[in-house]
Amino acid sequence: MRNIRIIVAYDGTDLAGYQKQPNDKGLTVQGCLEYGLSKICNEPIQIYGASRTDAGVHAKFQVCTFQTSGSIPAENIPRAMIAHIPKDIVVLEAVEIPLDWKPRWNIYGKEYVYTIHNQLIANPLTKRYHWHVKKPLNIDLMQAAGNELLGTHDFTTLKGTNSTPADPVKTIIGIHVEAEGSHVTISVVGDGFLYHMVRNIAGLLVDVGLGRRKVEDIKGYLAAKDRRVIGKTAPAQGLCLEEIFFTEERQQEVLQNKYSI
């Protein structure tokens, strides 16, 4: 038996999320990958992913593993999969790893990036990958609000409504808000995230950037442990799973270069 790790990228616009769903609920990343891998390995395949992205959310660097008794060389998997999965999903890399390596146990953290088009006029060329916010955002206030979320907290306030039970205590290591013209990004690194947590962070920071909420109220929102005290969840299309960190060194490199930590 062999254990294979694959790196996957996908445009989530037309997908029903990462996690496999009943057939009548649309294509999923997990379902498509398992179908394709079963074809090229000539046996049923079950994959395990590091992050369960929602419907409409994208990924540049999703990590999955699967075990197989098949003989296909790992380096041939990305090319072999092209014929068996939708064009919205691409296997970037495949490597053989120790049998005991599991994606949820052997990672140090994740980075998500939320993208906003901040201009009165929409951009039809990138609308699949951003949230269009028409009114000007105060980037400095958004960064100040993000700084209030750093550290280890109970993030119940920022979890999705009707989400499955999970430990709400998470650690946010870095938040960086940046604007280049009308292109605004909210980058977040943490040890793990609750359902809808990053999208709720984006929605909260946008409310601050628009003057609807105050930086000094952020700690109070967290202390309330109540989803109802914050606004709407930011739309899915602006969110992308940017990277999953296998090593502490790689995570620290990103934190130093992008987050100045």
Mark where each language-model region is:
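Structured-RNA-binding interfaces characteristic of tRNA pseudouridine synthases
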Residues: 1-261
